[in-house]
């Protein structure tokens, strides 16, 4: 007769499996667990290229997604390339404001980035690319993620769909300084917007000579808060 009560060894094995599964689920922050399981922003364009740390390609892709017809080559001179690689982070933000976009900085944690992607906002960021023998900064666009597989999807360099694990991406992202921004139209609030941060970004837009765009950004926030 087959035993009805499982053996002690079977119970131990089953308990261990359940504990392992619970541990895996618990390792993902609650803020991420609440997001949709999988998102990919297919409308975000991709410009292939490795030159200048991928900055012109990434910026052109975000500008295009916001309605500006532009190519990476047209951005090289305004970004002071070649020769201005050290100032790319600041120059990209300055140029985005000249196109009338609000440069909204994000917190440097994964949940904050994925929250924006889930809301349909591509994230412009910098991360470290390389190996144990060589590494360097690279700009890219966070355009998707898979919560179950714990991967993010980047538009970067020669890869339209560069997949990285959550942990690998977080390490590369923070190693490069944890810089990430949204480039938003003045009427397009980020998900879970921080009012003070948005108003500061609007002031910076006005300081770049885009007073009307800055006024629209302020009005948009006032209509919802």
Tell where the protein language model's regions lie, with residue ranges.
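A generic structural signal for short, solvent-exposed coil/turn residues
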Residues: 16, 95, 117, 134, ...
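Bacterial N-terminal signal peptides that target proteins for export
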Residues: 2-13
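Short, flexible beta-strand-to-coil junctions
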Residues: 18, 127-132, 184-187
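Active-site-adjacent substructure of cysteine-protease-like catalytic cores
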Residues: 102-155
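Noncatalytic regulatory segments and standalone regulatory/sensor domains
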Residues: 25-28, 148-225
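Cysteine-nucleophile protease catalytic domains, especially the papain-like/related folds used
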Residues: 25-109, 113, 119, 188, ...
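C-terminal motif of bacterial Sec signal peptides marking the signal peptidase cleavage site
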Residues: 20-23
């Amino acid at each position: 007769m087959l035993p009805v009560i499982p053996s002690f060894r079977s119970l131990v094995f089953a308990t261990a499996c359940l504990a392992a599964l619970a541990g895996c689920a618990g390792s993902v922050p609650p803020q991420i667990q609440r997001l949709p399981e999988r998102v990919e922003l297919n409308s975000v364009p991709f410009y292939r290229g490795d030159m200048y740390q991928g900055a012109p390609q990434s910026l052109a892709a975000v500008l295009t997604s916001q309605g500006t017809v532009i190519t990476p080559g047209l951005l090289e001179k305004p970004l002071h390339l070649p020769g201005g690689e050290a100032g790319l982070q600041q120059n990209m933000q300055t140029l985005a404001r000249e196109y009338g976009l609000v440069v909204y900085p994000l917190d440097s944690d994964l949940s904050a980035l994925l929250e924006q992607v889930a809301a349909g906002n591509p994230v412009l960021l910098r991360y470290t690319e390389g190996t144990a023998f060589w590494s360097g900064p690279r700009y890219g666009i966070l355009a998707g993620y898979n919560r179950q597989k714990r991967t993010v999807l980047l538009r970067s360099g020669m890869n339209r769909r560069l997949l990285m694990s959550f942990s690998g991406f977080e390490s590369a992202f923070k190693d490069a300084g944890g810089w990430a921004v949204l480039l938003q139209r003045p009427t397009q609030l980020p998900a879970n917007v921080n009012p003070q941060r948005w108003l500061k970004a609007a002031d910076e837009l006005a300081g770049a000579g885009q007073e009307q765009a800055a006024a629209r950004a302020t009005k948009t926030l006032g209509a919802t808060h």
